[in-house]
From Swiss-Prot:
UniProt xrefs under InterPro entries: ASH2, ASH2-like_PHD, ASH2L-like_WH, B30.2/SPRY, B30.2/SPRY_sf, ConA-like_dom_sf, SPRY_dom, Zinc_finger_PHD-type_CS
Protein location: Nucleus; Chromosome
GO biological process: brain development; chromatin remodeling; dendrite morphogenesis; imaginal disc development; imaginal disc-derived wing morphogenesis; imaginal disc-derived wing vein specification; instar larval development; negative regulation of gene expression
Domain of life: Eukaryota
Protein's gene: ash2
Knockout or disruption consequences: Generally pupal-lethal with mutants showing a wide array of homeotic transformations. Adult escapers are sterile and show pattern formation abnormalities in legs, including tissue overgrowth and small supernumerary legs. In wings, the pattern formation defects observed include duplicated bristles and sockets, transformation of campaniform sensilla (a class of sensory organ) to bristles, ectopic campaniform sensilla and reduction of intervein tissue with increase of longitudinal veins and cross-vein tissue.
Upper lineage: Eukaryota, Metazoa, Ecdysozoa, Arthropoda, Hexapoda
Function, as annotated: Transcriptional regulator. Regulates a number of genes involved in wing development including activation of net and bs and repression of rho and kni and controls vein-intervein patterning during wing development. Required for correct expression of a number of homeotic genes including Scr in the first leg imaginal disk and Ubx in the third leg imaginal disk and haltere disks. Required for stabilization of the histone-lysine N-methyltransferase trr and for trimethylation of 'Lys-4' of histone H3.
Subunit structure: Core component of several methyltransferase-containing complexes. Component of the SET1C/COMPASS complex, composed at least of the catalytic subunit Set1, wds/WDR5, Wdr82, Rbbp5, ash2, Cfp1/CXXC1, hcf and Dpy-30L1. Component of the MLL3/4 (Histone-lysine N-methyltransferase/demethylase TRR) complex composed at least of the catalytic subunit trr, ash2, Rbbp5, Dpy-30L1, wds, hcf, ptip, Pa1, Utx, Lpt and Ncoa6. Interacts with hcf. Interacts with trr.
Species the sequence originates in: Drosophila melanogaster (Fruit fly)
Protein name as it appears in the record: Set1/Ash2 histone methyltransferase complex subunit ASH2
GO cellular component: MLL1/2 complex; MLL3/4 complex; nucleus; polytene chromosome; polytene chromosome puff; Set1C/COMPASS complex
An MF annotation (GO) of this entry: transcription cis-regulatory region binding
Amino acid sequence: MEDSQMDTSSPTESSSEVNFTAEEDKSQETRSAAGVCYCGKERNLNIVELLCATCSRWVHETCVSYQLGKGKLLPFITNYVFVCKNCSASGLESFRKSQATISQMCHCAIANMQQAASRDGRRQIQFSKDKEIIPYIEQYWEAMTTMPRRLTQSWYSTVQRSLVKDVQTLFTYEEHAEHGAMYGLFHQDLRIIKPNYESMSKSGALRLTDDGYTQASLSKNNRQKRKFPGTDSGPTGKKGRPSSDITANVKLPPHGYPLEHPFNKDGYRYILAEPDPHAPFRQEFDESSDWAGKPIPGWLYRILVPHSVLLALHDRAPQLKISEDRLAVTGERGYCMVRATHSVNRGCWYFEVTIEEMPDGAATRLGWGREYGNLQAPLGYDKFGYSWRSRKGTKFTESHGKHYSDAYVEGDTLGFLIELPEEASLDYLPNTFKDRPLVKFKSHLYYEDKDKITETLKNLHILQGSRIEFFKNGQSQGVAFEDIYAGSYFPAISIHKSATVSVNFGPAFKYPEVLVEHKAKGMHDRVEELITEQCLADTLYLTEHDGRLRLDNMGL
């Protein structure tokens, strides 16, 4: 019974699993020139590479932020759908491996053995079914397919049928006097092995939408109710088990941050990381199998800098509800806080907040806060924040409230301006965190950084000439705070009970005249600045530690 379920495709279907045509050969060189990895380096057949279903870019596995797991994939597999971060509206990759046919597994096994021989300086293009192909599939079964490993050997006969059936389309055959039946690849160029997305698309098994999602079209008898993002645990098969079909929906994270992620709490902060293509010994690490199950050196990665200013998903109290576009937040019960993704440490900056809903008993404290501000308290509770309260217009810092303005209410649009004079003696480059440990959470890597609250409090100093000013519906309410502590400040929102506010980080402000009058920048301008600063900081770290960043220093 097992045997009959494993490979029932026709010769035509099998040969289309990997797209080999005359047109493919002619156009391969053109496409490969345009389809290099994020890192800019050429293809490397010794490691896993994934083909984007949208742009046909080949991406090295170790340049993918999504942690696929060392040893859990093989080069030359074709049973997957991958969307690169450049084609995804979320800014993060999506990947789904499907169940492979025995024909695909044979093809993958032969290709890997051929490449291994070439890497060792040998030329071997044909392999024994019994002595090499079947043992290879048995060894790497889980890396090739999502299909459960077979408990009997009945699938051996399926291998034989698949190889014979696809001779002259996928495989070559030769009878050897000593070794018996020998099989090789009909197309010797391993660079053209890839998923046949075109065939999947034509058959309805794959559909690419504008925002990079990949999903199947459902038949009339198999339509599902629409589900909202984050409410679906994935498609299921018989008996409610997760489906591994290529037609399954691929769930993408919203706006460049994983749906499931660690929160900053209990004295630790977590910073999303991505592979650093400029790190030394990157290729040696990529091709090494010795790192399976071992800690990855932090300097091989870098901080993933957000490409837009939004409310942070990880840097918030978990009970706060963030909208899908990450530009609105709703509170629940007592005061708690969320910070934005970007901070500022010098210059004059501005953002706006609109009070969307303010039920009876609800309140907000809005303003600017630093990274160590308590997320389970109102902004202005400690020395790390400066806030403006909706009730009575009170201003707060260090839990001391002073009258500042009239109250603000539902429908008001508030402006928040901060001015931080530059200090010549300070280094404003951001931390690289490359010396911090990397922790894995739900297939993504994060730098883990311990809070240094005591040390930070000890080193607080006043920044002369600094100020914070608040605006209501375009009108200044006066300077709220002067000579505040120096440091990096985030737009911060704290909410009591079920109030809802929306944020506007620019460029289309409701009251743009505030920027002109005060020569301020909108928070949206901070994006390119931070990308440049982070790149420079990473480069300086690698330069300063040149010669000391070695894989053999890590115990290999």
